[in-house]
């Protein structure tokens, strides 16, 4: 029996989002975190079928569209990639909101989107750009020292922006699109160093995103973000920008309401600001997504790679 999975693809600043509209098994009616756990425990093969080759690629971020728990939410969503599941995804939320408009589900205005780490507020503007009011972001630790084999001592901040990040400003690497291989090798070594040293986020949270910053002549900063699974973010990374704002706010380098223009390694830009909150900040990230495909993924029973090429 052939299985069919309906998808709509978009990209946000070059970073793709694959919205799964239908075709996944029922995950029950619990919270997005509970449904994510069911998906991971019982139906993870659907994630790999959508994201891994031959139907996907390491760059893709998947977003499973779910019925929300709260009646005042526009949608629920579970984010995943080639290595597992994400608590929140900024660029993905922008892509989801833009796609919901394409589907005729929402119009311009403010919409609530349920995620596994909480409900985020997203505004679809008249020009179809999207502002995402993220979950609470905060810096967990400042100036953490780490020895990275092959590179020497490294210092960075640990911050939460919806995922855990290790943020490095003084790294000696050239943050540019033609230097991605070297940036990936460096960031991967840092992540391995963190794991080896037992350095984590709060409550033992795995630091699975590494963010490198550099000056940019046209914007406030340019960044390279290594995501779980060794793919780099083509967008400026919404959760990473949120983590960056948390550090800037903690250091008194960015005032509430001031706009921070964050460029990605390929030059796409998010505009970000924050309001102060108890225990950290609440950031808002604005960017644009563009639609790229509508498709039906076919899964044949006799296909040896029907659930993806799993390494």
Curated annotation (Swiss-Prot):
InterPro entries: Pro_racemase_fam (IPR008794). The keyword Isomerase applies. The keyword Isomerase applies. One of its GO terms (molecular function) is 4-hydroxyproline epimerase activity. Keywords: Isomerase. Substrate binds at residues 90-91, 209, 233, 238-239. The active site is at 89 (proton acceptor), 237 (proton donor). It catalyses: trans-4-hydroxy-L-proline = cis-4-hydroxy-D-proline. Its EC number is 5.1.1.8. Belongs to the proline racemase family. Catalyzes the epimerization of trans-4-hydroxy-L-proline (t4LHyp) to cis-4-hydroxy-D-proline (c4DHyp). Is likely involved in a degradation pathway that converts t4LHyp to alpha-ketoglutarate. Displays no proline racemase activity. This is 4-hydroxyproline 2-epimerase 1.
């Amino acid at each position: 029996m052939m299985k069919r999975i309906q998808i709509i693809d978009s990209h946000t600043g070059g970073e793709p989002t694959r919205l799964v509209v239908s075709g996944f098994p029922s995950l029950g009616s619990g919270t997005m975190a509970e449904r994510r756990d069911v998906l991971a425990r019982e139906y993870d093969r659907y994630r790999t079928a959508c994201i891994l080759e031959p139907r996907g690629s390491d760059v893709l971020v998947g977003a499973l569209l779910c019925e929300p728990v709260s009646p005042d939410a526009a949608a629920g969503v579970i984010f995943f990639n080639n290595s597992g599941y994400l608590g929140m995804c900024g660029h993905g939320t922008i892509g989801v909101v833009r796609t919901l408009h394409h589907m005729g589900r929402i119009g311009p205005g403010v919409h609530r989107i349920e995620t596994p780490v909480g409900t985020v507020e997203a505004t679809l503007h008249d020009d179809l750009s999207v502002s995402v009011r993220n979950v609470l972001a905060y810096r967990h630790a400042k100036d953490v020292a780490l020895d990275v084999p092959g590179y020497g001592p490294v210092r960075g901040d640990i911050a939460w922006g919806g995922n855990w990040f290790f943020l490095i400003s003084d790294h000696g690497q050239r943050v540019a699109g033609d230097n991605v291989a070297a940036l990936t090798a460096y960031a991967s070594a840092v992540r391995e160093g963190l794991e080896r040293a037992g350095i984590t986020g709060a409550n033992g949270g795995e630091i699975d995103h590494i963010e490198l910053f550099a000056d940019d002549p046209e914007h406030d900063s340019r960044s390279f973000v290594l995501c779980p699974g060794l793919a780099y973010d083509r967008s400026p990374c919404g959760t990473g920008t949120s983590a960056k704002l948390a550090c800037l706010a903690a250091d008194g380098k960015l005032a509430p309401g001031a706009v921070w223009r964050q460029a990605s390694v390929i030059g796409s830009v998010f505009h970000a600001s924050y309001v102060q909150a108890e225990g950290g900040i609440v950031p808002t990230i604005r960017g644009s997504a563009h639609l790229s495909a509508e498709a039906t993924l076919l899964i044949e029973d006799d296909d040896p790679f029907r659930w993806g090429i799993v390494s």
